[in-house]
Every structure is written in structure tokens, then in C-alpha cells.
Design a protein with these regions (language model features):
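Structured mid-to-C-terminal alpha-helical surface segments
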Residues: 4-13, 21-240
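Non-catalytic nucleic-acid-binding interfaces of large nucleic-acid enzymes and RNP effectors
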Residues: 16
Length: 240
């Protein structure tokens, strides 16, 4: 939802909300209590929320946490969606205030959110860590769109630090040669290109964006981060 708002895709096909909590215990009982309290707020919009399931997110995901399936009801309409709640994410240098425009009301609300650099860093780490096994075309689209539409708002020094902090949080490190090989494989892989074409057909907002354009933008910018990271102490980039 945050990325959709940032790049101006108002009706993006997503049913996911990702959030992180600070200074609170993260377990099923407390997470349920928090979401129930939020859902009980009276806004006179007629929408009612019901938690349908709660479970722990296991280690195979990018981050451990709690996943909640929720059903929103408005008269006869029902809309399921999920909320993933994590804790102590490495937001570098820190959360920022973001004005989120509401869908059904002509106003915005203030929320604390990731800064652009941390948002990009998490997706870049996922792209490198998963390599050819990454089936989440949304990650590639998000990086491309943010790098192109918000380039003047991105600090590469902050992005480098955010990338390093994300890798440390997720306990990953990458050698220079490994980065180059992974990016070359991503760029040239016919399987990823086919998945991209399916993603493009299923999502109108992608328009006629080719895999070549997307992968080139991603490769160029991750290589730039790699170049910077090897020149700062405490880096997660390893020299071969």
C-alpha cells in the first residue's frame, strides 16, 4: 500500500499490509489485541473488521513476525486482506511522517513509514538473496518505479547504509563477484522474463514496460550500492 501511494498507483492489485512495531512484544495474543482495538475505532464509515486467522511467519520469510487474515465488511461487500506485523526492522536512519491519501474520503492521514532508502534496501536485499528463485515480480516493479519516479529524493549514501543495515538484520552478506554473477543471471534469465510478462499482462499499471528496462535499472543501481558499500567500514559487502 505504501509503494502504491508513493508511485501513484491508486488501485494496485494488492491485498497486503506490512507494518512494524516498536517497543512492544510481538506475539499472537498481543498482536490480535492491537488489531482488534484499531478495528473497533468508530469512524462512521460503516466498515467492520473481523480477524479470521492469526499465525506466526516462519523463518523462510524475509522477516519473522505475525500474519493476520482479516475480513472487511461494508453492507453486503466482503473484502479479505492480510496484515504482516514484524518488529525491530532496520529503518535507516529512521521512520518518516507520510501523508497517506484515503480512498473513500477527501483527506489524508499521517502515518510513520519507511523512508524511501529503507524501502529500496529491503527489496534490493531480497532480489540479491533470492536470485533466480525470486518469483515476486512486484519487488522488481517497485524498485524500478521508485528509482525512476523518485530519483531526486533518494540519497545513495543513505541507501548504502540502509542496505547494510538490512543485510545485517537479515544476516546476509554478499561478495563482489557473487553480486556480479547474480545480477548477470537475473538480467539474462528467460524464466524471470516470462514471469515478468505474465505479471505485466495481469497488472494494467505496468503498461508496456519490458523486462530489459526493469532489469537494467535494477542491475545498475544495485551495482552502484555494491561499489559504495565496499568503500565504507562495517560493510556487508565482502571483497573476494
Amino acid at each position: 500500500m505504501l509503494v502504491a501511494s508513493i508511485v501513484g498507483v491508486d488501485m494496485r492489485a494488492t491485498m497486503d499490509i506490512d507494518t512494524t512495531v516498536k517497543a512492544l512484544p510481538l506475539n499472537e495474543k498481543d498482536a490480535r489485541a492491537i488489531i482488534e482495538r484499531i478495528g473497533e475505532l468508530q469512524l462512521e464509515d460503516g466498515v467492520k473488521f473481523k480477524i479470521t486467522s492469526v499465525k506466526e511467519i516462519m523463518e523462510e520469510f524475509d522477516y519473522p513476525g505475525i500474519r493476520m487474515m482479516i475480513e472487511a465488511n461494508l453492507e453486503r461487500m466482503r473484502q479479505p486482506f492480510k496484515i504482516d506485523i514484524s518488529t525491530d526492522d532496520a529503518i535507516t536512519p529512521g521512520a518518516v511522517e507520510y501523508k497517506y491519501k484515503l480512498m473513500f474520503e477527501d483527506r489524508s492521514i499521517s502515518v510513520l513509514s519507511y523512508n524511501l532508502e529503507t524501502l529500496l534496501a529491503e527489496k534490493m536485499q531480497t532480489i540479491l538473496a533470492r536470485g533466480l528463485a525470486n518469483t515476486r515480480m512486484r519487488d522488481f516493479y517497485d524498485v524500478y518505479e521508485i528509482m525512476n519516479s523518485k530519483a531526486d529524493q533518494i540519497s545513495f549514501d543513505v541507501l548504502k547504509k540502509a542496505f547494510a543495515a538490512t543485510c545485517m538484520k537479515r544476516e546476509t552478506s554478499f561478495g563482489e563477484e557473487e553480486v556480479g554473477e547474480t545480477l548477470d543471471k537475473i538480467k539474462d534469465d528467460s524464466g524471470l522474463e516470462e514471469m515478468w510478462n505474465r505479471f505485466k499482462r495481469a497488472n494494467y499499471f505496468v503498461d508496456d514496460l519490458s523486462w530489459g528496462e526493469v532489469s537494467e535499472t535494477i542491475v545498475d543501481n544495485i551495482e552502484k550500492i555494491s561499489f559504495l558499500a565496499t568503500r565504507f567500514p562495517g560493510s556487508v559487502m565482502k571483497r573476494e
